[in-house]
Structure formats: structure tokens, C-alpha cells
């Protein structure tokens, strides 16, 4: 940081302020995590200087002999992590990974079956404001109104009715185990290909704590951050038969030069994920999420679907304490707990207001938070959301947050 401090004091101040925010707050955004110093070091290395259009040993530029090695390491480690036949580590984001699969599997206007956004899906799974919903004819499946879990009978019914060319499984706000085998059976029954977006659960999948979609899906996409705890980026895993189509769709189809410094950071993160302690970490992520859900339930909050199987907890704050997700997010942010407002199934509020909040445990677990810490986190959340205008409660909540964060510094 010394070079930035000398050369650009404004950006230096931004970075320092952001570090302090991360260190002094409890991060509960389910899609965020804290990378290791090794991952950050790789991403900030001289590899950022290198242009490398193409793929290892098939580049359009000279001088790629070393980035070829790092990209190959990333590919091989990802294959080992997930048991994939082919991996492309070049997508700059999960959204671009999804776009590439759509371009391979579909023609403009084709019918696709994806999860309703307000039920836990993702923008790139057919939202009208997203390219996916504008280029393709998406039809939706959702969760059962009673148990708030995916209704596979409904998925089959909608699939039979609309005959999609592609079925998309995966979610951005779904706290239960997804039955990829069942999705594959449904896809086969209607003659569709299956794509799984495992961005949120990739870390759990890598260590065997969630069923692996690679066995069942034609295409699997993911981000490399979130539970996988790598740099921000994307990745595609697919059957060997789709290798050439996927690779040429990423380059030269929708991207040019790959970000080789980010790919090296992906390789480092995948190497970390192959170590035994990564499974211990993921086990703690799940235990912490269960503790968070159970304690909030004990405190009188309604947890969507009644609990969690993964890293994520969705909470109906409007139905529980009569405030919107927007108010809940702002109230928690004021005391140093960061989360995001989120629609819940059958939500009547607008997406920028919402009836719920989405909470996740990966980032705080990386800091060393255990079940005891998350029980305290849940009680702090309860304290302030039950009376969000109570200054005394807010002050107490902030003090208790500071006690937790001081015990678990972000980076030593």
C-alpha cells in the first residue's frame, strides 16, 4: 500500500476506509467472502500486465509461457475439485459464464425454464430486465407456497407444458439442498439440456457437503468467489462434447483478453480448496447458518422454509416484526452488520423494498466466527429489528458488534 499512499492519496483513503469497514463490521451478505492474502497477492501481481488472447499453448500473443502454466494449473485444480471433464476459467463473471452457455445451447427466442427471481432465482435466469429475459423466452418454476421449497412436481408440469430447450437449476437466495438428479430426470423426460448455476454453493459442492451437479448437468456455471472463497470471477464446467463450443464462445465470442492475474488468483484459491481444512471451514459455514436460523426462530422471526441446509438464511422481517427488508438492511448497517434486503417467495413488496433480508455465514466464518458467535449475532439482530428506532438498543447492538469484531480481526 505504500506506493498507492505516495502516489494517490484519494484512492489510498478509499482502500483504507473500505478495509476498516470490512474489519469493523460483521459481513452477512451471502455472496461475499474474504479471500486469503495469497489470493490477493496473486491478483495484484505482474500478471496483470500480460495480454493472452486464446488458450494455453494456443495464444495470439507471444510471451505467454508463464501465464499458460498458471491458467493450466487453475483448470487442472478445478477439474480435480469438481470431477469435471472440461473447465474454462476465463469468464470474467458468473453472468458471462451463463451467457456463454446460453449462446451454446440456445437460439434467440428459444424457451428456457428457470427459477422465479422472487423465489430465489437470479437475474440471469430469465429476469425481464436482464439479457437472458430479453433474448430468450423464459418460463418460471418456483417454490411450494406451504413449505417454501422447490416443487419438483411443478417443475415437471411446467416443463411438460412449455417443452423448454434448456432447464436452469440453481439460485441466489435458496437455503435448501437442490436435487440435481431430479432436475436431470425432468430434463430427460422433456428432451431438454440441463444447466446448473452453482455460484452460491460451489464451495460446499467442492468438499462434498452438497450434491455435485457435474454428474448430472450438461453445463455447470459458477462464480469463483462466494463460498469458493476465490477472486471475483466466473467459470464453466461441462462435458467434453461441449468443450470446443464453450471455449470458442468465451473467446473470441464474448471476451477478448483473459484476466491472467485473476486466473492465477483462481488457481491459488482452488489450491486452497483442495486442502483438508477447507472442508472443516465449509462444515463450520453450515453449522453457523443453522445456528443463525435456529436462534432467529427462537427470537420470534420467521425463517423462510423453516431453516437452512447451506450457507444462507432468508428471513421474513415484515411478517415477523412489521418492517420492510429495506428498513432492516439500513438498521443493521447502522450498527455494523451488513446484509441485503431480499424478496421472499410470494412477496408483495417491490424489489427495492422487499419483505425479507438475506443473510449468509461464509465471510464471518472465514474470520473465525463459530456457533457461539452466531448465536450472539442473531440476538443482536433481534434486539435492533424489534425496535429499530430505539437509540438505546442501537447503541447496545453496535457495542456488541464491536466486541465480536475485535475478537476476530479480518487480517492479522
Swiss-Prot record:
PROSITE patterns named in the record: SHMT (PS00096)
Sites bearing N6-(pyridoxal phosphate)lysine, chain numbering: 226
GO molecular function terms noted in the UniProt entry: glycine hydroxymethyltransferase activity; pyridoxal phosphate binding
Reaction(s) this enzyme catalyzes, per UniProt: (6R)-5,10-methylene-5,6,7,8-tetrahydrofolate + glycine + H2O = (6S)-5,6,7,8-tetrahydrofolate + L-serine
Documented EC number(s): 2.1.2.1
InterPro entries hit by this protein: PyrdxlP-dep_Trfase (IPR015424), PyrdxlP-dep_Trfase_major (IPR015421), PyrdxlP-dep_Trfase_small (IPR015422), Ser_HO-MeTrfase (IPR001085), Ser_HO-MeTrfase-like (IPR049943), Ser_HO-MeTrfase_PLP_BS (IPR019798), SHMT-like_dom (IPR039429)
Required co-factors: pyridoxal 5'-phosphate
Pathway annotation from the record: One-carbon metabolism; tetrahydrofolate interconversion; Amino-acid biosynthesis; glycine biosynthesis; glycine from L-serine: step 1/1
SUPFAM superfamilies with a match to the protein in the record: PLP-dependent transferases
Subcellular location: Cytoplasm
One of the record's GO cellular component terms: cytosol
Binding-site residues for (6S)-5,6,7,8-tetrahydrofolate, renumbered to this chain: 117, 121-123
UniProt site (Plays an important role in substrate specificity): 225
First-tier enzyme category under EC: transferase
Alphabetical UniProt keywords: Amino-acid biosynthesis, Cytoplasm, One-carbon metabolism, Pyridoxal phosphate, Transferase
Top-level taxonomic group: Bacteria
UniProt record, GO biological process: glycine biosynthetic process from serine; tetrahydrofolate interconversion
Subunit structure, interactors included: Homodimer.
PANTHER family linked: SERINE HYDROXYMETHYLTRANSFERASE (PTHR11680), SERINE HYDROXYMETHYLTRANSFERASE 1 (PTHR11680:SF35)
Annotated function: Catalyzes the reversible interconversion of serine and glycine with tetrahydrofolate (THF) serving as the one-carbon carrier. This reaction serves as the major source of one-carbon groups required for the biosynthesis of purines, thymidylate, methionine, and other important biomolecules. Also exhibits THF-independent aldolase activity toward beta-hydroxyamino acids, producing glycine and aldehydes, via a retro-aldol mechanism.
HAMAP family, alphabetized: SHMT (MF_00051)
Family classification: Belongs to the SHMT family.
UniProt protein name: Serine hydroxymethyltransferase
Amino acid at each position: 500500500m505504500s506506493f498507492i499512499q505516495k502516489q494517490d492519496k484519494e484512492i489510498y483513503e478509499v482502500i483504507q476506509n473500505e478495509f476498516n469497514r470490512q474489519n469493523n463490521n460483521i459481513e452477512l451478505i451471502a455472496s461475499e467472502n474474504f479471500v486469503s492474502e495469497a489470493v490477493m497477492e496473486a491478483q495484484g501481481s505482474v500478471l496483470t500486465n500480460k495480454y493472452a488472447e486464446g488458450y494455453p499453448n494456443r495464444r495470439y500473443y507471444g510471451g505467454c509461457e508463464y501465464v499458460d502454466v498458471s491458467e493450466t494449473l487453475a483448470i487442472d485444480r478445478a477439474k480435480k475439485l469438481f470431477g469435471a471433464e472440461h473447465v474454462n476459467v476465463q469468464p470474467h463473471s458468473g453472468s458471462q459464464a451463463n451467457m456463454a452457455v446460453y449462446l451454446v445451447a440456445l437460439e434467440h427466442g428459444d424457451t428456457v425454464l428457470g427459477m422465479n427471481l422472487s423465489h430465489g432465482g437470479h437475474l440471469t435466469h430469465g429476469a425481464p430486465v436482464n439479457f437472458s429475459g430479453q433474448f430468450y423466452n423464459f418460463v418460471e418454476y418456483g417454490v411450494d407456497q406451504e413449505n417454501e421449497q422447490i416443487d419438483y412436481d411443478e417443475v415437471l408440469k411446467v416443463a411438460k407444458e412449455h417443452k423448454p430447450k434448456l432447464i436452469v437449476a440453481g439460485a441466489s437466495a435458496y437455503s435448501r439442498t437442490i436435487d440435481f438428479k431430479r432436475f436431470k430426470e425432468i430434463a430427460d423426460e422433456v428432451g431438454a439440456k440441463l444447466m446448473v448455476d452453482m455460484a452460491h454453493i460451489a464451495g460446499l459442492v467442492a468438499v462434498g457437503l452438497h450434491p455435485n451437479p457435474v454428474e448430472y448437468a450438461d453445463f455447470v456455471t459458477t462464480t469463483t468467489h462466494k463460498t469458493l472463497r476465490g477472486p471475483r470471477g466466473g467459470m464453466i464446467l461441462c462435458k467434453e462434447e461441449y468443450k470446443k463450443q464453450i471455449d470458442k464462445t468465451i473467446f473470441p465470442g464474448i471476451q477478448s483478453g483473459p484476466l491472467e492475474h485473476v486466473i492465477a488468483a483462481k488457481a491459488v484459491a482452488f489450491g486452497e480448496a483442495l486442502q483438508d481444512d477447507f472442508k472443516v471451514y465449509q462444515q463450520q459455514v453450515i453449522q453457523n447458518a443453522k445456528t443463525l436460523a435456529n436462534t432467529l426462530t427462537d427470537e420470534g422471526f420467521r425463517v423462510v422454509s423453516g431453516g437452512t441446509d447451506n450457507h444462507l438464511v432468508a428471513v421474513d422481517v415484515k411478517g415477523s416484526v412489521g418492517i420492510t427488508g429495506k428498513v432492516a438492511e439500513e438498521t443493521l448497517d447502522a450498527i455494523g452488520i451488513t446484509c441485503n434486503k431480499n424478496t421472499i417467495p410470494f412477496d408483495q413488496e417491490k424489489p427495492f423494498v422487499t419483505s425479507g433480508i438475506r443473510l449468509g455465514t461464509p465471510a464471518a466464518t472465514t474470520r473465525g466466527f463459530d456457533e457461539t458467535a452466531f448465536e450472539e449475532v442473531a440476538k443482536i439482530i433481534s434486539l435492533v429489528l424489534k425496535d429499530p428506532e430505539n437509540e438505546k438498543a442501537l447503541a447496545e447492538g453496535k457495542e456488541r458488534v464491536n466486541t465480536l469484531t475485535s475478537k476476530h480481526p479480518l487480517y492479522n
